[in-house]
Amino acid sequence: MGIRKVKPTSPGRRFQEYSTFEEITADRPSEKGLIEPLRKTGGRNVNGRITCRHRGGGHKRHYRVIDFKRNKDDIPAKVAAIEYDPNRSARIALLFYADGEKRYILAPVNLKVGDTVMSGQASEIKPGNAMPLASIPLGTEVHNIELRLGKGGQIVRSAGGYAKVMAKEARYVLLRLPSSEMRKVLATCKATIGRVGNVEHDDVSIGKAGRNRWLGKRPRVRGVAMNPVDHPMGGGEGKSSGGRHPCSPWGQQSKGVRTRNNKRTDQFIVKRRSK
């Protein structure tokens, strides 16, 4: 993948950059049976109340059904296409299994059309193959990692992401996550070999506010620019500092204070993420 800069024919175009999409082999979804309608919520719940701010609008999309479980063991599959997915930063690969089934998976780096991938304990150590963490050698880069056996990959799924297998101890495997957190995961949980493709995704310059609106992202207003009724840091005469430590609209501190509440899984975190 490369990044293409555009000519500055207008102020809005001056800083825009785009992916060259050179790895994409299909200009539309190849398999109609693996796409579903996707209804927009605008960040609202069933009661119409905003539960996720800064969402709304954006281009209409179809959802691509991705196989995060990789539970079709010991059956080889051929990569038929590498496709664009508007719902995620990574590219997706269309697999044709030997028994006729078709599935989408996240496309790792260096996976090409015509390659063969497989999942299962006896799979080869190469990009795109999925297997239990217990079968993966130390130092290997992995992605799409399960946290619960059979639930499907939940972490390390965005473009360019990878975790590294650091150690194995009894029933657990120690992983270093992209955040630098060191975490123990059950050795029977599956992971996929390699790092997620589209590595240069973070280097693309959006260039203008309107392009974020195309992606369904609404403006993010600073708390100090609001009125006191809207935010704890709002109000004041002229330009103010907010008068307190940075926080959310509900008063939860947002810088330098630990706000993690899930004590149940603290036992699996060997070293917290570094900022």
Swiss-Prot record:
GO CC terms of this entry: large ribosomal subunit
Annotated InterPro entries: NA-bd_OB-fold (IPR012340), Rib_uL2_dom2 (IPR014722), Ribosomal_uL2 (IPR002171), Ribosomal_uL2_bac/org-type (IPR005880), Ribosomal_uL2_C (IPR022669), Ribosomal_uL2_CS (IPR022671), Ribosomal_uL2_dom3 (IPR014726), Ribosomal_uL2_RNA-bd_dom (IPR022666)
Pfam families from the UniProt entry: Ribosomal_L2, Ribosomal_L2_C
Domain of life according to the entry: Bacteria
Chain intervals for the UniProt region annotation (Disordered): 221-275
Gene Ontology molecular function: any one: structural constituent of ribosome
Keywords: Ribonucleoprotein, Ribosomal protein, RNA-binding, rRNA-binding
Annotated GO biological process: cytoplasmic translation
Function: One of the primary rRNA binding proteins. Required for association of the 30S and 50S subunits to form the 70S ribosome, for tRNA binding and peptide bond formation. It has been suggested to have peptidyltransferase activity; this is somewhat controversial. Makes several contacts with the 16S rRNA in the 70S ribosome.
Subunit text: Part of the 50S ribosomal subunit. Forms a bridge to the 30S subunit in the 70S ribosome.
HAMAP family, alphabetized: Ribosomal_uL2_B
PANTHER family: LARGE RIBOSOMAL SUBUNIT PROTEIN UL2M, RIBOSOMAL PROTEIN L2
Family per record: Belongs to the universal ribosomal protein uL2 family.
Protein name: Large ribosomal subunit protein uL2
